[in-house]
């Protein structure tokens, strides 16, 4: 299992475009991929769950990944977040 913390830098917070791209990448993964925010969890495979948190600029969240090719999925998700200036590198 991999768990990593990120801080939102986008002034709009976790908005629809990056959330949909993260969901698209996560759906391809056969294992468990969850976003943890303020003690709550949502599957990264559900855009509704992610958007429901309303994560704002400056707030942090964790990604928790468990299954085959965890490191590759983390890399893919980080590329999406970095390319869209969603989180700090």
Where on the chain are the PLM-derived regions?
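Residue-level signal for pocket-adjacent positions within structured domains
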Residues: 3, 9, 81
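C-terminal structural segments of small proteins and small subunits
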Residues: 54-89
